[in-house]
Amino acid sequence: MSTPEFKVIIVGGSLAGLTLAHCLLRAGISHIVLERRSVIAPEEGASIGILPNGARVLDQLGIYEHIQDTTEPLSTAHIRYPDGFYFSSRYPEIIKERFGYPIAFLPRRRLLEILYTSYPDHSNIYTNKNVIKVQSHDNQVSVLTEDGNTYRGDLVVGADGVNSRVLSEIWKLAGNPSLTKREGRGRTIEYACVFGISSPISDLKPGEQVNAFYDGLTIVTIHGRNGEIFWFFIKKLSRRYIYPDLIRLQQKDAEGICEEAKSLTVWKGVTFGDIWERRETASLTVLDEFLHHTWSWDRSVCVGDSIHKMTPNFGQGANTAIEDSAALANLLHSLIKEKRAEKPTDSDISLLLRQFKSQRLRRVQKIYKMSRFVTRLQARDGLLNTLLGRHYAPYAADLPAKIASGCIAGAEVLDYLPLPKVTGAGWNRGHRRSTMYILLGFTGVFTSALAMVVLLHIRDIAS
């Protein structure tokens, strides 16, 4: 008598969900994807950056070549300050030299299309499937959708984003009434973002990026193939919001926010108004920041934005989600291979999910902390960040490359598929430790020096 196959139910046709579907397909593990919306790749104005840690996994899956066909690799970044000072960095080129892959941006919709069209069996991907309940059974789990259907499997994976229904069901199944409140306290909102895509402007060259820093505001532009402009307008809010007291903005607010900033210079003679007037799409969202502690319960687990959410400043949110999917697929492949003719038991799955969190948490924590730091540095949030950004960063050689490299090295890779031919020495270097020590060490020295200057200034005034 043959053993029933192990089946994974992926909730969410997101980047993390579709990447996991590809990973499981290559591992020979049965799965389905349940997507709440009517289409996998909706017409939305967001763009997404693929960095080497995400690119390497997608390359293993045979997907990256399709991304290459539609993107313009970044080579140069320009950083501009409110006083008109600017400097240029070739850190994108350094990243490519170290890891073999460039930093590349494309519309989120296009990336989802690539993931969907390159997946060979669309009968495994269901749309209009809004999951409303997750239930645990003996050695099995099921999900109920709004249309009344029930899907049974051996593991449920929530890849359903910031307001994850699967994660809320996990917290409910855990049976601890205070869990949701405790986890919620770590979910905050301090920034809002208008993101969009605009038609080309001659002074914004393809393959280049501009970061324009203002007090409480960061404007990022990435210039893609044929000059297409992907942009982010990231504004600090008047106060910090903590769950459940979360601000929700309307799309109509985007116009008011952006109209006020039309005169701000982005690069050379280009103002934000020039970019705004050439917009093809634009959307407004608040930027949640959190790193949850409870990722799984029984036979349910979450990946990607469901459990860790970062601002777009550092560009690692999507790539970290890709890594989550790869790490979980590795563990599932290993377990099923080990069990052979037997299906994994509840205790097997429980151990696997603990291993998943243990394996991922430290790396995710580091990337999350670095993302928060970069966001506030760019927004000139407070005196120390203002001085660090203006008077240290421009003279710190390839600091941006060091910071980025530290969060790329040590990335997850699919251990049951061959490594890509594309590679670089950066994967084997110890950038991770040195980057944090450089920043922490300098911050300590800089703070001490700043305190001395302030004390001397006060003494002079007093005398």
UniProtKB/Swiss-Prot annotation:
<keyword id="KW-0560">Oxidoreductase</keyword>
<keyword id="KW-1133">Transmembrane helix</keyword>
<dbReference type="GO" id="GO:0016020">
    <property type="term" value="C:membrane"/>
</dbReference>
<dbReference type="GO" id="GO:0071949">
    <property type="term" value="F:FAD binding"/>
</dbReference>
<feature type="binding site">
    <location>
        <position position="49"/>
    </location>
    <ligand>
        <name>FAD</name>
    </ligand>
</feature>
<keyword id="KW-0472">Membrane</keyword>
<protein>
    <recommendedName>
        <fullName>FAD-dependent monooxygenase nodM</fullName>
        <ecNumber>1.-.-.-</ecNumber>
    </recommendedName>
</protein>
<dbReference type="InterPro" id="IPR002938">
    <property type="entry name" value="FAD-bd"/>
</dbReference>
<comment type="similarity">
    <text>Belongs to the paxM FAD-dependent monooxygenase family.</text>
</comment>
<keyword id="KW-0274">FAD</keyword>
<dbReference type="InterPro" id="IPR050562">
    <property type="entry name" value="FAD_mOase_fung"/>
</dbReference>
<feature type="binding site">
    <location>
        <position position="305"/>
    </location>
    <ligand>
        <name>FAD</name>
    </ligand>
</feature>
<feature type="binding site">
    <location>
        <position position="318"/>
    </location>
    <ligand>
        <name>FAD</name>
    </ligand>
</feature>
<comment type="pathway">
    <text>Secondary metabolite biosynthesis.</text>
</comment>
<keyword id="KW-0503">Monooxygenase</keyword>
<dbReference type="GO" id="GO:0004497">
    <property type="term" value="F:monooxygenase activity"/>
</dbReference>
<comment type="function">
    <text>FAD-dependent monooxygenase; part of the gene cluster that mediates the biosynthesis of the indole diterpenes nodulisporic acids (NA). Nodulisporic acid A (NAA) and its chemically modified derivatives are of particular significance because of their highly potent insecticidal activity against blood-feeding arthropods and lack of observable adverse effects on mammals, in particular the tremogenicity associated with the paspaline-derived IDTs is not observed.</text>
</comment>
<feature type="transmembrane region" description="Helical">
    <location>
        <begin position="438"/>
        <end position="458"/>
    </location>
</feature>
<dbReference type="InterPro" id="IPR036188">
    <property type="entry name" value="FAD/NAD-bd_sf"/>
</dbReference>
<feature type="binding site">
    <location>
        <position position="108"/>
    </location>
    <ligand>
        <name>FAD</name>
    </ligand>
</feature>
<feature type="binding site">
    <location>
        <position position="35"/>
    </location>
    <ligand>
        <name>FAD</name>
    </ligand>
</feature>
<keyword id="KW-0812">Transmembrane</keyword>
<keyword id="KW-0285">Flavoprotein</keyword>
<dbReference type="Pfam" id="PF01494">
    <property type="entry name" value="FAD_binding_3"/>
</dbReference>
<feature type="transmembrane region" description="Helical">
    <location>
        <begin position="5"/>
        <end position="25"/>
    </location>
</feature>
